[in-house]
Structure formats: C-alpha cells, structure tokens
Amino acid sequence: LFGGQGITLHSRERPIPSNFTGVVQSYIENPLLVEGKKAHMRLYLIFLSYRPLQAYFWKNGIVRFAPEAYLPKKGWLSNSAIHITNTALNQNHSNIKLLDNSEIEDDGSIWGLTPYVNRISANRGESDQIWDRLYQTASGFVNLLREKGFFSETSSIPNNALIPKIIGFDALLDSDKKVWFLEIQRNPGQTGKGPVNKINGSLYRELFKLTFDTIERKMMDKRTTEF
C-alpha cells in the first residue's frame, strides 16, 4: 500500500471475498479532530545497532490531515477525502493546503507533531501524558518487531556494529487521546511539502549526531582501555 494505494473502506454489512488478498483493519470511529478534520501521525524510530538492540524514539514527526471535515452521514464511506489522511492520495483535492513556507508547522494540511500535541493538550501535564503514550506505543512497536523476528536477518552482523536506520510508523489518536498503531514504514519518505523537509532534515541531523557520538564514545573507550 505504498503511497496509500489500494485503500478502501467497507461497512460490516459487506462480506470479505474468500479470495481477498490484503490487510484488513478495524476502523476507528471516534478519531480526534482538529478544526473538524481527522489526522494521522508519522512517528520515527532511529536504530543505531541491532546486537545489542539500540533504538531511539524521536520526539517529533509529521501530522497529515484529511481534506474534508469528519461529518458522519449517509453514504459517507464512499467519500475517501473524509477518512483518508494520506497526502499522496489527496494531493489534487481542492481543500488540500500545502504551504511553501517550511517554517510554519501548525497550518495547512501538514503539521509538525510538536505543535499538534500542543494544540490538542489542555495544559503541559496533558501534553506530557500524550508524549508518554506515544513513547509507550513506540516501545511496544519495537518489542513487536523483536517478537516477529524483524531483526533475525541481522544475526550475521557483528556485535556492537553500527547500522544506522530510520523506521517510521503511523498512528492515530482517538477522541479519548488513546494511541492506535496503523502501519510500519520501513523506508519512510524523506521529502514533501510544507514543514516536511524541515522536520525530516532535523531527523537526519539527529541520526548523524547519534551515530557520530556513538562512534566517538567507542573510540574514546578503546583509547582509554589501551592506555
């Protein structure tokens, strides 16, 4: 489903064909709305090594909004612009607003995750709670990857070898601000409109910083040992 291709919505009344091949997910009927619109979050994990497993949750990300207001009514399932928040699918919609100014992270159809969390939080305490839930989701995601053997292909990698990698995953907040995991992005997109390039630029700078800090620390440990 790269780029949102193949996404469709169906009611329970419509049976799934026996020869169907694909992924079926339950629909979250009470998504958290901002200015009446549904959104999803793109979150990131930075992996530095696999043996031992060393991963970091990046405290920022990208939020994408559906172009039309979330107003349940008869026949609304057929209108993907209400439900689908994928920018690639909605890029030609008249309501999509993609800003040229990358410094603006709280306007248009794409936001930064930090201003989004601030917007939906009543106070600092609630903001911290949401970030904690996002972190717990990321931690659970890493454990799921481990349980499903995602890292088994790295068994031939020497211990302590640095293999920097960014993995993205999408999540959604419901009206109770509960986090719902949606999908994994093994090779998340790096460029885009609005604040995407600025945010992803910061992400990769963080990746390089963590990588080189780790290399420097290893070299320092080696020099200290040899001394």
Task: Please name every model-derived segment.
Residues 1-166, 174-180, 194-227:
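Catalytic core of tubulin tyrosine ligase-like
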Residues 185-194:
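Glycine-rich phosphate/pyrophosphate-binding beta-alpha loops
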